[in-house]
């Protein structure tokens, strides 16, 4: 009896002829390899003749249901740092379409976990997110400010099983200390407003300050008792959510079993390192033996932070490699990326970061990036509760993580999936053990040319398939069905920010954040003023407990287009204290542009960034009245007006361009009737 010969599968161009003769000569194999390298988007999976002599033994992936393995907890995203700011401003149906790509199961990325920032009113990376309790008095009736609660509700609407989590970056000033009884009450109030206003029950709290560690005694004495006393006993705690002192928390947990019982999972950021973002770098952050032995779930609670618009380099392919690597090497069972979506203005720091892009709500344009489909190669084929098969997780080449594989099974049904990321071209044999589904194998593939393309299904022969895989690709082989490359069709075309622009804030509810305004520090929200109309107020009364150093201008909010140069910016202002300003040609947080400043005692100043260009005092200034500010920028000539009177004109050679902004000290200063209008360029204005 002849031994059984496994079918060899390879990818050939659609319509190409496949010889049935045995391939005996290396030259012939080389020519066939050249043909294979021409594969782009159109190909078939074709079994070659059983007479082929293998060039090398295939890499074996044996799916043994008896293999040890940890429970898969999901692939998630961290909406924080104001990275999601522009998403809620999208019109329908585009806003719902974007949310489908992010959270709808078996449609797009299908994120299975969502962690959001507990806002503070202080900068947390790409801007500031508002707090549910700006003052201690608001603890009694916390406010549903911002968009993170809305985002969690939209995620759960699409996937009732999505795991919800939260974490602060900074704190309002009244908390006093980041690990205090007041801060514990502030955490609890966030859960209360989520429950009261959106009907949300969160699953986890990251009991820490983002990347600043935690205090286990605070968790024991303040946070856990506060949660239990107010009806949140089921909420679990993860710590330390840090990006330093990797895995050292286990030294403390090992010594104190009471503390150990309080921590449901341990999470760290950038376990594989940050810059230079190389998949084979040795950052020295691998999970320790003590961490792995503990049996406690290990999380990569923030990872990647790159642009999903690229396939190679540090983009989607790198992300797929990293997801496989961190389980195989570290036994990390939950992987969360920052951020789910690039929904910030381009020139804000960390713009172009995320799984997809939606940063032009005024026209409804968005882009589904390749990273969505790299994530889908795991999330559409394995649910939380599936179990990894450790013996089937590994490297294709022991010298590099460019090629790897991770295998999982459903303990209830016997379904299985294998996610393979390749570096070089190579051959792989998947052997399916007894007790796992042995029906047809469904194949999905992503390359730079085309992502998430379903391939012809393949039948097992003697429990195995043997495959030749393309380089720099992602494959999923699975017994499951129901996946799809979801699509809502082509979105509207991209357009620049509208000019002229005006907002009188009358179309909002009090407490709303107005469309297209991106707070960078402080909180600007719509409010009613004593005259009965609505306006924009800066509501944070004092600087909070900062995340990192205070590198920013006073509280300010951005809007507009980075290409604006020759234009007027104007607003009505009412000062409660300190000063206010309007500005233009803001390029980034280190290039503030031109600033027209008015103080409550009537002093005015025209600045280029932090340099004073002109200044003076308004006679008989009425601090209790509304005043009209206007900044005119035309070529090199910059002029400032107050109440219709030109107070300064300077000639400045910076030739900068950029966005508009409003700014205020930490006072409840008001803005209304904000307008931006075009001016003819300097040469166009000449007769």
Regions found by a protein language model. Name each.
Residues 58-202, 207, 215-217, 221-225:
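N-terminal catalytic cores of secreted or lumenal carbohydrate-active enzymes
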Residues 183-204, 211-306:
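Active-site neighborhood of glycoside hydrolase catalytic domains
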Residues 300-382, 387-398:
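Aromatic/acidic polysaccharide-binding cleft in carbohydrate-active enzymes
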Residues 380, 391-439:
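Carbohydrate-binding surface patches
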Residues 420-523, 528, 545-547, 612-614, ...:
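C-terminal beta-sandwich/jelly-roll accessory domains of carbohydrate-active enzymes
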Residues 505, 569-571, 626-634, 638-640:
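Short tryptophan-centered beta-strand motifs in secreted/extracellular beta-sheet-rich domains
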Residues 540-605:
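Secretory/extracellular carbohydrate-interaction modules
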Residues 647-676:
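Flexible glycan-contacting loops in extracellular carbohydrate-active proteins
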